[in-house]
């Protein structure tokens, strides 16, 4: 290829001084990384963390993000560093509970998002078991830098939540905005009873949910905020 014969792909083409030969300089795109997140990660490309087979909680939960075996403490959590890339987390189950993000007993998980990329979460269950966007067991701790968008939570059953707490002493903090929409259950819809459908549901004592930015929970039948435990607190929008 020479300067006189170049007819296509003009953008980003340079020519060598020595012989006038054209060259196209580019950085190859990184392939998207797929599969569940099961331990600390620092992303090097867009991350599509999807779980489709039983994995978390000794195989009783299908999850796209959970701590498989990393010892964690308050000062040494399992860190998922998005490193400026996109992150989508999904659970797709046909026989077990679907929890896109699952935080087990005594676990500490932190999602680092310095670039402020949107974190997308979906959870679907073609079985009648529960589906949750984020699920926290007892004494579990989750910190995420948002924005976070839980765009779909669906089950054929009656129990579905954008964020669900089940156990005492757990805490979730989203530093940024939170959107929860399209939470539903086929059985709940059929019966016209939506007691198990919630945006944020807390059933443990001494639990707390904090969102520092704006919150939009809409587009479904059921309760936006549901608390059933003693001394549990939901604080949204800095209030």
Give the residues covered by each predicted segment:
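All-beta strand scaffolds that present successive hydrophobic residues in beta-strands
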Residues: 28, 33-34, 74-75, 79-82, ...
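Extracellular beta-strand/beta-solenoid scaffold signature
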Residues: 1-14, 21-23, 32, 38, ...
